[in-house]
Amino acid sequence: MATKVTIQDIANELQLSRNTVSKAINNTGVLADATREKILRKAAEMGYKQFAYLPLFQEDAAKTAAPSILPSDKREIAMLTARFLNSSHFSSTMLDRFQSEIDHLHSCMTIHRISLIELKEKKLPSSLNIQRTAGIICFEVFDYDYAQMLCDLDVPLLFVDTPVMDMRPPLKADRLYMENRIEVQNAVAHMVQRGKKRISFAGDKNHCQSFFERYMAYKDAVEYFGLTEGLSTCAMPSGQQNYPVSLYETIRRFKTMPDAFVCANDFVAMDLVKALNELGYSVPDDIWVCGFDDSQEASYFAPHLTSIHIHGQIMGYTAANLLMTRIEEPSLNYRTVYTETNLILRESTGD
């Protein structure tokens, strides 16, 4: 059996610290681009699990690239989003990988923001030329009716996360998610093992399918451990207007505060920590908090935030594969794919 390659093995080969290698592989912290590139190349060369199936060198991949599968009059890959995606969003790393993987198509990637009016009226962004569009990838498109309109375009389509799909007809498109259940349940188990009994959830579970799955994973876990008291102190205000204020007002009304919170994402977690501090509670001394995404901010927020890491590079590679194969074979059955996530323990849970 082949020996499993570890982060320490890569560090030894490059004579770098394990922490430096971990930052490059998990896309956290600040590193020089040359150092990050050197580490990722060595990881691929050594067969590290996260990079073993990626091209070792982009130059080699470009040299051997096949002719474009796209017709000459349809060379645009359109990215649609209903909100601004900043560098803290997991899509930042993912899109870098996605774009590098579709380079051989000789296509251009265009980005289109869906306005509130376009969302309401179920119209495409005015900047999008659908006649020249070979495929569409969607981020933060969580309006179900709008998503259905996109499915009716008869254009190869990939959703990265979706509206909440329970009790609704499935979208006629490929769907890509990060794994939302396993590590949330591991986080709850970790809290229980460390003596936490009243564990609650924070975040709008109906915001998107991933938030819903994270909530259901949390709920299943506390029910499994027989610790359902925390269900009564979940902080789940809905909507995006003044969310930090809504969250603060929600937890301010609690007569009994939980021992710990599992949050829908890191930004909910950070808003929650600030609200708890305003109410006189300390994290982690009084209450533990776990986020999701492992955003750049998680590692330097005070306290350093326990989170669940999304592998953006792997999601980017998978997204490119899903969309390219859909373009090549439009009649394929629709696919739903989940990519691995990992629990990262830090200060906000006493680690």
Task: Give the location of each predicted region.
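N-terminal helix-turn-helix DNA-binding module of bacterial transcription factors
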Residues: 1-65
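Amphipathic helical "hinge" segments at domain boundaries
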Residues: 2, 48-124
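Short, solvent-exposed amphipathic alpha-helices that sit
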Residues: 89-105, 183-186, 209-229, 271, ...
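Short beta-strand elements in bilobed, periplasmic/extracellular small-molecule ligand-binding domains
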Residues: 102-116, 201, 219-244
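Flexible loop/hinge segments that line or gate small-molecule binding clefts
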Residues: 139-183, 267, 293-305
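Hydrophobic alpha-helical segments within soluble ligand-binding/sensing domains
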Residues: 174-202, 241-249, 269, 310-328
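An alpha-beta-alpha
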Residues: 185-227, 335-350
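Flexible loop/turn connectors
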Residues: 248-351
